[in-house]
Amino acid sequence: TTNYILTRMIRAGLSFAAALKEAQENGYAEQDPTADIEGHDACRKICILASLAFGRHVYPDQVPTQGITGVTLADVAYAESCGKKIKLLGRAIHRPDGRVCAFVAPHLVDLEDPLSGVEDVFNAITVRGNAIGDVMFYGRGAGKLPTASAVVADVIDAAKHMKTKKYLGWGPGGAEVAVPPAEVESV
């Protein structure tokens, strides 16, 4: 949803409000788009991904989150003048001290960065590995068909594993994992 809105602001010069309205009319944004445009959906996703990647519970209330509602056409023009695009990014970093730094916010992304080419209804995840470097997974992320596909895949996965005795739960903990906003470093 946010990629679609930002793409329409960049390519068509639409205001945030006009791009959001268009996204809603096309079925890419909910009637109440708060979770998407305020970054809450991205925050939940980065919590899940960070927890899976780093084996630590990361909770939404531990992740500094800022959405795109404050992004203006002047911001878009400034980014373009610097050879960059504005993207809403969720980031999770496993620090050498074992803590996880996670945050969600609009970022200026270099045009040479593959993430700058992720536009419209597409999403991407970049994973950095010690041996392989950066790997980007890219695909549709907004609209009824990608959403329906993800839900069906989750239902099938749950049905396949109904008889297993392995349970994944969100127990207590996590407070020592996330880095407070004052400690977030530039990456």
Positions of PLM-derived features:
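C-terminal transmembrane helices and immediately adjacent loops/tails
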Residues: 129, 135-137, 158
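Short acidic, glycine/serine/threonine-rich loops at helix termini
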Residues: 6-10, 75, 139, 149
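Substrate-binding/catalytic subdomain of NAD(P)-dependent oxidoreductase enzymes
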Residues: 18-117, 122-124
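Oxidoreductase and adenylate-handling cofactor-binding alpha/beta cores
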Residues: 2-13, 44-58, 154
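Catalytic-loop motifs flanking and including active-site residues across diverse enzymes
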Residues: 1, 42, 147-150
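A conserved regulatory-domain signal marking ACT and ACT-like small-molecule sensing domains
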Residues: 150, 155-187
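Internal, active-site/partner-interface "lid" segment
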Residues: 1-3, 20-22, 26, 164, ...
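Glycine-rich phosphate/pyrophosphate-binding beta-alpha loops
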Residues: 133-135, 139-145
